[in-house]
Amino acid sequence: GVFLGRQKDVDWIYEAGGASRMFADYWQVFQKPLINTDAEATGEMVNTYHKLLCGADELKRFAAAKAWAAWEGSIATLNPRPHLGDDFSDGHFALALARIECHYFVNQCFFEPNQLLKNMHKISHLPGIIVHGRYDMICPAEQAFEVHALWQACQLHIVRDAGHAQQEPGIVDNLIKATREFAIKLA
């Protein structure tokens, strides 16, 4: 899915009031490492997670990383996929994923506000294909529509029976079709 890296996009996933409203049960698991932290008072999940993920306490680091990865893995597909979460439950994978993502998010993805949208004119003449799941809870489809509106040479494929994960059958099918289409154009 398309992720624009704006504060509201990060907040949708990692702060209360966005995806947490759809997955309240998984959200409770995501919040567990934050009990007795600044996040309880401030509501700043990402900043508090960043402190835990970079802290000296190894047990807290891994607990936070696993909760972060479990949250993301749990909301990535339209229908639950038990084996999708296998990688997410590995402590080292979870720590790498959580630290990288969290580092970007506390630094506003190293973007100026709306930087991607403001610069779409630079690539709007280039062909492209966006494949986005209709029920993507990590990157809501609104972001794909915003990019598509500014990218004249781009096709937008909204997959009706998919969430965020590239392993979902509809996403896989559309990615293969897009790859074949470009292979034919470039041949």
What are these regions (language model features)?
Residues 1-48:
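A catalytic-pocket lid/entrance helix-loop region that shapes and gates access to the active site
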Residues 5, 9, 103-120:
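Active-site nucleophile elbow and catalytic-triad environment of alpha/beta-hydrolase enzymes
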Residues 73, 92-113:
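Hydrophobic, aromatic-rich cap/lid helix
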Residues 47-85:
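Accessory cap/linker subdomain of secreted extracellular hydrolases
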Residues 123-124, 130-132, 136:
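Short beta-strand/loop motif that positions the catalytic acidic residue
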Residues 112, 137-143:
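Conserved alpha/beta-hydrolase "acid-adjacent" motif
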Residues 154-187:
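Catalytic active-site module of serine/aspartate enzymes centered on a nucleophile-bearing elbow/loop
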Residues 68, 141-154:
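Active-site-adjacent alpha-helix of alpha/beta-hydrolase-fold enzymes
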